Structures are given as C-alpha cells and as structure tokens.
Amino acid sequence: MGFVVIQQPGDGRQNCGGIVGQIRLAKPTISLNVGEQNGAVLFADVQGYGRLRESDLPNYAAEILRPVARLLDDHETHVLTRNSWGDAIFAVFDDVAVAAECAMAIQQTIGSVNRDVLGYPFDLGVRLAGHYGPIRPIFDPIQGRQTYVGTQIVQAARIEPVTEPGMIYVTEAFAAALALIRGAPFACDYLGEVDTAKSHGRLPLYALRAAIAGD
C-alpha cells in the first residue's frame, strides 16, 4: 500500500497512511530555474536554550548537538548542508524521506535527554519545521563551503517559530513529496491554515509523525 494524503470524512482533518477517499494532494509539480534543485529543508529550535548559563554550554554541545550531529552523520550521503547557531539547527537533504526520518530522530533524541544528565533544573524541548521545494546552491565565502539559499529556505524558517514545542510541522509540498513514496512509515495530520512568523502569510500545514496501524 502506498503512502498518500487523504481526506478524513467528517472532521476535516487529513493524514498520510492509506488509500481512502479522495486524494487531496496530487503529485507536486515544481518548476526549477537554472541552477536550482529540489531539496527538503529542516529547521529546529531548542526550547530552553535561553535559560542556559555560560557554564552549561559545553554540556549542551556534548549532550544535545553531538547526538544530532551523529544522526546527520548516519545520513551523510543525503545531507547537502547543515549548520547550528545557538538554539537553532539547520539541515538540507536531497531526499524528503530521509529528512522526515531525521526530523523524528532529532525530536526523539532531544526530547528524551534527562535533565539529570544535562545537569539543568529544567527539561529541554524542540520544535521542528520542514519544507520541500527548489533550493539554490551557493558558495558561502564566510563559511568557506557550499550552502543553500532561496525563498523556500525562508519559508521553512518562518514555520518553525509557530510550531508547537515537541511537534514537527511540515508544508503541503513536504507532505505531498512523502505521499509519493511507497511504504514510507510516516503520517501527516492536517492542521489547517496557520499564520507563519514575520507576516510571511498563512500556509496549510501538517504535523509529521510516525505512521501507526490504521492510518
């Protein structure tokens, strides 16, 4: 059975996981300009980072950033670029299913770190946002390496601030790209149109999760 986005009768919600009813999302048709390629973009924001003391930062790097780096290392053949600054983690993938897998792994990894291990008097959380669309590679002279830019990167960045802590919000394009992958173990629950950050507009968004029996 394939992985599709479906309309749930009665409650107006949609999810991914079976061929039922009318498929709302058709195969995405994305026009590429010269020099562009399709990619999946993830932004993550670590909740509680602003409460850390200077003396907490080495432990944060060891217990939060290092495990996330290892997750990305495990998928390095599909990771086009990655970066972090403060509470933010950014990664671009050439495969939307790998991006979804990494998003859920990051969610699980950060969410499961015990405050006793960190030595903090509070738990850290994470919110993640994903988008799929045309991105443009450029060489960044400041970083000294290739990175990716474009309006689609900005769109993903504007979704992350409105994501509920502990959740992964993705765009319709991300959900549709996943829907084309046969047997992909993911589900996307339709959230409705959501106001994005910095007056970027309203977008139909989905909550990404692992598929369960009955989806």
Where in the sequence are the language-model features?
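Residues flanking N-terminal targeting/processing segments that define the start of mature chains
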Residues: Q8-N15
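Catalytic NTP-binding/metal-coordinating core of nucleotidyl cyclase/transferase enzymes
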Residues: I23-C102, T109
